[in-house]
């Protein structure tokens, strides 16, 4: 059977619009997290759903941060962060960290203690993953921070807060038996 060494033509692919992409991403449910840092670059925090596991050897997760965000320099200079996963009833705190309020106002909304890395850990977080940033990769408008987890704190039985369809939703920690 004859073989062809010709390379198939690659047709141009139309770019997806920013609006279409955002609409599509609103269909992905995600945990709501406060990403916090403290150190020489200052104390800072923001709300994020762009967080996910990378590997368990070493335990590593990723966080995406916009390079134009007011908190960007603090995170890069400090090189540490804590992923504080929010529970049901903490929508106001999420909105506070996701809005235009000052860093002082944001942190006044909760009770905090310093984690192993010095990053602020929210006392009432469903889960807190204290991390050191091990690598950063730039893609488009954002940096992807790869973060090695050095300490974990969690509250068993705490209900989760998720964001889906541009709204907050309550996710019970346990499903009652049928």
UniProtKB/Swiss-Prot annotation:
Its EC number is 1.5.1.42. The keyword NAD applies. It comes from Pseudomonas syringae pv. syringae (strain B728a). It comes from the Bacteria. GO terms for biological process: nitrogen utilization; uracil catabolic process. InterPro entries: Flavin_Rdtase-like_dom, NADH-dep_flavin_reductase, RutF, Split_barrel_FMN-bd. This is FMN reductase (NADH) RutF. The gene is rutF. It catalyses: FMNH2 + NAD(+) = FMN + NADH + 2 H(+). GO terms for molecular function: FMN binding; FMN reductase (NADH) activity; FMN reductase [NAD(P)H] activity; riboflavin reductase (NADPH) activity. Keywords: Flavoprotein, FMN, NAD, Oxidoreductase. Belongs to the non-flavoprotein flavin reductase family. RutF subfamily. It holds the Pfam family Flavin_Reduct. Catalyzes the reduction of FMN to FMNH2 which is used to reduce pyrimidine by RutA via the Rut pathway.
């Amino acid at each position: 059977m004859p073989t062809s060494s010709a390379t198939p033509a690659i047709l141009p692919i139309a770019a997806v619009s920013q609006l279409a992409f955002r609409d599509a991403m609103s269909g992905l449910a995600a945990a709501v997290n406060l990403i916090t840092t403290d150190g020489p670059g200052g104390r800072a925090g923001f709300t994020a759903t762009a967080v996910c596991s990378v590997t368990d050897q070493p335990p590593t997760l990723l966080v995406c941060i916009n390079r134009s965000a007011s908190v960007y320099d603090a995170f890069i200079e400090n090189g540490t962060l804590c992923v504080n996963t929010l529970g049901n009833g903490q929508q106001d705190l999420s909105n506070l960290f996701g809005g235009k309020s000052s860093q002082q106002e944001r942190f006044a909304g909760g009770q905090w203690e310093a984690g192993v890395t010095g990053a602020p850990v929210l006392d009432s977080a469903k889960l807190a993953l204290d991390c050191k940033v091990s690598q950063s990769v730039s893609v488009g408008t954002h940096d992807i921070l790869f973060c090695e987890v050095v300490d974990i704190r969690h509250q068993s039985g705490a209900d989760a807060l998720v964001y889906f369809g541009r709204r907050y939703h309550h996710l019970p920690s346990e499903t009652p038996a049928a």
